[in-house]
Amino acid sequence: MPDLARLRAKRLFLLDLDGTLYLDERLFDGAADFLRAIRSRGGTYRFLTNNSSRGAESYVEKLRRLGVETEISDFLTSVDALVAHLRAQGMAEKLLYVCGTQSMKRQLTQAGLRLTDDRDAAVDALVMGFDTELTFQKLEDACILLNRGADYLATNPDWVCPTWYGFVPDCGSVCEMLFRATGRRPYVIGKPRPDMVRLAMARGGFSAEETVLLGDRLYTDIACGVNAGIDTVLVLSGETKEADLAGSAVQPTFVLGSVADYLSILQECKKRPHERSFFAPISPAAAGAVRRAAPHRWSARAVKSQR
């Protein structure tokens, strides 16, 4: 059973956004302090999001509006992963029909990719994103292109996107609808594929042991970390509830109620001058945060061994 020293020793924190740090326009309690604590300890965080409906600049604007100072370089999106994949597969010159927002199309065009809205053009591939501007015409065009044999890619497999009033269909739900109509399934680019994790580690020079991924979804966030070979933290502030763990083939390394619980653990740490890792005693308050959130992940030995 993992001990809490592993959580405190991390240097690269890969963070989901929706359901992990905020919900719509509400920043979760402790989120801003958690990010500040990471940097004050000399750590690095990167935001990984499957949401292709907006560019990194809009996330920067949103987080600043919510009280978090950040930069475009702090983000890696499923659109970034899509561009990298197309280039790696020699598809950078292919003609794409994109079912996505104008923001997504603008990002792809700025990356030098060729796009068309004409289903009768010589389309090489259909790309499905989280399209908040989706129309029936786009769905019809997608079916026609898939029936013609166009290559088929999707930015993410998420079934739903959380909002303040509940959930709305995400890219995965639309892809399932297209499957029912055409029998075609896409090659999925974003989480749970490990590409964004590996890219973030490579850019920062971090090892797998130094890296942790935090997210609220088992089948995308946590599976992504597992596929990349890094520790994962499931937070119960978004889509996944603790009851969902029993029936899941994907299991996180740790389960916490929210990022505020991780903050409680970090706040107990004092770095020894000669150490990169943190091994300060954990208080009953911080221990309780983990125990309450994940009794089946809790080990009293992990605390006793640090006293």
Ranges and model annotations:
Residues 273-274, 280-281, 285, 307:
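Intrinsically disordered, low-complexity repeat segments enriched in small/polar residues
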Residues 296-306:
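Short, intrinsically disordered C-terminal tails of secreted or membrane-associated proteins
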Residues 44:
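N-terminal phosphate-binding loop and flanking beta/alpha elements of the actin-like ATPase fold
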Residues 1-15, 23-41, 52-76, 83-274, ...:
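Asp-based, Mg2+/Mn2+-dependent phosphohydrolase catalytic module
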